[in-house]
C-alpha cells in the first residue's frame, strides 16, 4: 500500500557520501556524525594493531587489523528529525572501483580536506566521478587545530583544481595552537573552540564591539575583523540553486578530532542538501514521487557474515516504497521475487525493516543471481544507467600454491569481482587469470579474503599490462581482424565483454589509430 505521507517521508531524507584522501579525517567525521545522531555513545578512534578498539564504521577483519577503511559502509541515523543515509567510502590510499560506484547512489557529497595538505590525488579522482552527475558538494576543511596552510590559498586551490566556486560559510579564527574557533558568516555567530568561558559562542554584536577583545585579545580581534571584511567582500553569498547544480560549494572549517564544526556540517546537510533525486533509466526519468517501486544495485558484499558465507546486495531505492513481503521484478533475469527480509545497516549490523523509501539503502540477500547495476521494479522493464565499471590501473597474474583448488579460486574471484573488489580477466589465448584494480592494496585484500573466506593460498606474478580498454564494435569484420591481429592482448571480463590489455600507452595508441571504427573505452556500463 502506498503511504499518503510519501512526500513527507521524502522531505525527511538525505543520502550522501563522505570522500577524502587518506588521513584527512573522514573516519573521525563519520564517527562524530554517528555520535551526534545518538547511534553510538562514544566515538571510536582508529588504533594500531592489537589495541582491540576500532572505529564503528570499520568492521571487516582486515580493516580492524590495519586501522583503515577498505569497504564502503552504509549507515543510517537520525539528526534533528531528518533521516541521514551516510555512505562511508574508503579512506586508505588504494580504493576499489566500488568507491567510484558509490557516488552514483548518493544525492550529495561531503568532501573532507586536510588543512595542512590541501587537495590530494584521491580527492581529485573521486571529484572527477562526482562531477559527471554534477553532484552537490559541501566542503569541510579539517584539522584547523594543527599547523595548516593559509585558508585563502586552499580556497584558491579548490576553485582552480575542482572547478567549484567557493562560498565560505564559516571562517577560522587563527589556526594550529592558536586556533580559537570560527565565525559562522551565514548565521553571524562566533563559535569558540574549547572555550574557557561559560558561553561557547558570541553574537554578532559582540563581534563588532570591543568586548571581543576579552575573548581573543586586542591584536587577534583587529586581525580577524579585517580578514572577515576582506572575505565577505571577495566571496559571494550562498545561493542554494547554484549549489544544487554543482556550481558552488559551501566551505566549513573545523576540527573533527576536537569535535568542532561537525554540527555545522549536519545542519547544512539538513538545510541545503537535496532530498532524494530522480534517476535516469534507459527509457525515461524515474522520479522519487512515483507510486511504483524502483531501485538499483550499486554494491555487492560477499561474506559479510562469515558464519553464513552470505552475499548482500545494496540497493538504492529510487521511487515508490518498499514494504515487507512485496513482489518485485528482477528485470535482467525477468523473474518475480518476494522480498520479505530486507534490512538497513549500521556498519555491518543488520536491522530488519518493514518499510523503506526513496533515498534509503536496503540490503537484500543474494544467492548469486544479483549483479551490480541490476534494476528491480514492480513490473516495468527498465534499466537504470550511469552505474559503470571503471578501467583498472594496476594488474597482476594470480596463481595457486595448490593447483587442485582451481575451482574454489574461480568461485572466490567471481564473488570478489561481483562486489567490485577487483576485476578478473581471462585472456582469449590461455587459461590465465589476470586481476585488475584501481589501487595496489586491493590485491592484498583479495589474497587475505581468499585465505580467510575460501581457504585458498594464492600468490601474484607481475604482468606486462599498464592500460585496459573495453572494446565496442558493431562491425563484425573489423572485430574479427582485431582478434586475429592482436589476440595476445585481448581478454574477456566476468561479463564476457571483450577488453584490450595494453603493455604501454604507445601500444594502445597504435592499435586505436589502426582501428578507427572500433571504440576503446575506459568505462563500461553495467
Swiss-Prot record:
Residue stretches making up the tr-type G domain: 11-277
Domain of life: Bacteria
Keyword Transferase: no
Gene3D superfamilies: P-loop containing nucleotide triphosphate hydrolases, Peptide chain release factor 3, domain III, Translation factors
Annotated GO biological process: regulation of translational termination
Keywords of the record: Cytoplasm, GTP-binding, Nucleotide-binding, Protein biosynthesis
Pfam family for this entry, one: GTP_EFTU
Binding-site residues, GTP: 20-27, 88-92, 142-145
CDD domains: RF3, RF3_III
Subcellular location(s) per record: Cytoplasm
InterPro entries: EF-G-like_DII, EFG_III/V, G_TR_CS, P-loop_NTPase, PrfC, RF3_C, RF3_dom_3_sf, RF3_GTP-bd
GO cellular component, one term: cytosol
Family: Belongs to the TRAFAC class translation factor GTPase superfamily. Classic translation factor GTPase family. PrfC subfamily.
Protein name: Peptide chain release factor 3
Organism (species): Buchnera aphidicola subsp. Acyrthosiphon pisum (strain Tuc7)
